[in-house]
Structure formats: structure tokens, C-alpha cells
Amino acid sequence: MHNYLDFEKPISDLEGKILELKKLASEDESVNTSDEIARLEGRVRDAMVEIYSKLSPWQKTQVARHPSRPHFLDYASRLFTEFTPLAGDRNFANDDAIQAGLARFRGAPVAVIGQEKGNDTKSRIKHNFGSPRPEGYRKATRIMEMADRFGLPLITLVDTAGAYPGVNAEERGQAEAIARSTEMCLNVKVPIVTVVIGEGGSGGAIAIATGNRVYMLEHAIYSVISPEGAASILWRDSTRAKEAASNMKITAEDLKSLGVIDGIIPEPIGGGHRDPDAVISRTEAVIGDALKELSARSGDELRSDRRQKYLNIGRNL
């Protein structure tokens, strides 16, 4: 059963009729509903094309947060072989909001880092809804340093509403951990390819996202603050999130035009949650092409280009 978003009501109604016809046909073999089902399925495709071709920034935010959207572990299981998670920050604890480790991508060894939100109540609590604590960022820093030491390309998959803002996280140095992770991300001499697969929220995202190549899925978002947070600050009214989203330049199209990202990965009609295998396959192709291009550059060139890329963003926006 699909989790329909509020703007998907025409799709929901049509697919509901299809289910009713299929149920009728299963209960009475003398009833032939195949032609009507085919007609309705065509209308569903047309409705999805029409709706998803003109999504507003707030609607894209809803798609980016869709509970059935593939998350880091879904990508890891399909993109990589021999994925070996590494745990702990060697300082305080392990944070399951950040998943990191070593793997093979198309047979070649790589290091992998990403945020995991979870897909049910138990796993969401385990992964803190994808909001990392300081331990997660220190773990990420450790994996980056390991990748640099062994010359492993680094692939990062971003999907977080932001770093965890709890008192305990602040007491353990959340800001410092994010800054150190960002610094390490900028300093390593290996290729870094980043894909924003869902939400890219604030410093919690940028800490693992300062890549040589940064891509976004078509319906992902990337911003310095959530629309709700921006609305609360600007108007002291979080219910104006829709209005905030429209003014924040958070979509892949906006960020590509501003030069913040390098490319957009198209999603299947109806969003990545409709066809996870297709969107992950497209992501694999983009990552593969980027790594092939970057592999020809020296470590010093990779680091210099990466640092200049982000200095230019700061100067020009």
C-alpha cells in the first residue's frame, strides 16, 4: 500500500479504482476487467507525469521526506559489494545515524559514508531519524582519514534534516565535530563524490558533502535550514513553511543554476519511492562516471579543486 502525499489525491483515487477492479476480478472469474484496468493505468501514468512535472518547492520537500523513499542502507545494499560497516568514534560512542565503512564499487575498493533515517519506528529510533550526534561526525572524520591514508575514493550519500540539536549533543561538541568533519572532507587527497538522495539539511549535511562532484536526485532538497525552521525565524510561524520553501532556493534545479551542485539525477515518474531499483541504478551510473573522470587527477589537484569550489560558492552567492 502506498503512502500518498496530499497533492497525489488524483493518483490515489485512480489506483484505488484499479485495486477495486482487481479484487472484483479475483472474486468472479467471469468478470473481465483487463481493458478498464489498462485504461486506468494509463490515466495514472498521465496524472503522475502532469503532477510531478510541476512540483512546487514545498511539494518536492514532501517527496524528499517520503517514508518509502530509499535511504542509505537501501543504496548500500545495491550499489556496493562487500560493504563492511565500521563503528565508533574512538572517543565516546557509536552513532547509527551515520553509517560508514569500506566496500567495493564496481569491483574497486572505496570508502562510504551516509546518513540513515530508518524505515519503521524501531529503526528510526535506532538511527535517530537520520540526525547525527557528534559521535557520528567524528566517526565520519575517522573514515575520511582512513580513506586518505589508503588512497580510497570516498562516496557520500546525504539524507538528513540536520544534525541533532539536543543539549547532550551540544555538550559533547556538536559544532566542533561538524567543523572537523567539514575540514577533513576538504583536506583529503582522494576523489569525493557526493549525492544528496533526500534531505540535505544545513551543516549536518555539508559535513560529509564537500565533494569534488556533488549531485542531487531530482526531488531532493538542499538548504541551510528546513522550511519550517526558516518560517519560525522569519515569521515566528512554522505553518508558513510552504511560503518559506518557495523563497529558499532548495530544489535541485535552483542549486544547479546557482552552481552549488554539479548535476541532477532524474527520478522515475512519481519519485524514487515508486521505483527504488531504477533511481539507485541511475545513481550508480552517475557515481561511476564521476569517479572515472576524477581518477585521472592527482591528490593535490583533487584537494585544490575541491577547496576552490567551495570558496567560490562562498564568494559568489
Curated annotation (Swiss-Prot):
Pathway: Lipid metabolism; malonyl-CoA biosynthesis; malonyl-CoA from acetyl-CoA: step 1/1
Short name of one Pfam family: ACCA
Catalytic activity entry: N(6)-carboxybiotinyl-L-lysyl-[protein] + acetyl-CoA = N(6)-biotinyl-L-lysyl-[protein] + malonyl-CoA
Subcellular location per the Swiss-Prot or TrEMBL entry: Cytoplasm
CoA carboxyltransferase C-terminal domain boundaries: 40-293
UniProtKB keywords: ATP-binding, Cytoplasm, Fatty acid biosynthesis, Fatty acid metabolism, Lipid biosynthesis, Lipid metabolism, Nucleotide-binding, Transferase
Location (main, coarse): cytoplasm
Any single biological process term in GO: malonyl-CoA biosynthetic process
Domain of life: Bacteria
One GO location term (cellular component): acetyl-CoA carboxylase complex
Subunit structure: Acetyl-CoA carboxylase is a heterohexamer composed of biotin carboxyl carrier protein (AccB), biotin carboxylase (AccC) and two subunits each of ACCase subunit alpha (AccA) and ACCase subunit beta (AccD).
HAMAP family, per the entry: AcetylCoA_CT_alpha
Function: Component of the acetyl coenzyme A carboxylase (ACC) complex. First, biotin carboxylase catalyzes the carboxylation of biotin on its carrier protein (BCCP) and then the CO(2) group is transferred by the carboxyltransferase to acetyl-CoA to form malonyl-CoA.
Name under which the protein is recorded: Acetyl-coenzyme A carboxylase carboxyl transferase subunit alpha
Species classification: Bacteria, Pseudomonadati, Pseudomonadota, Alphaproteobacteria, Hyphomicrobiales
Gene name tied to this protein: accA
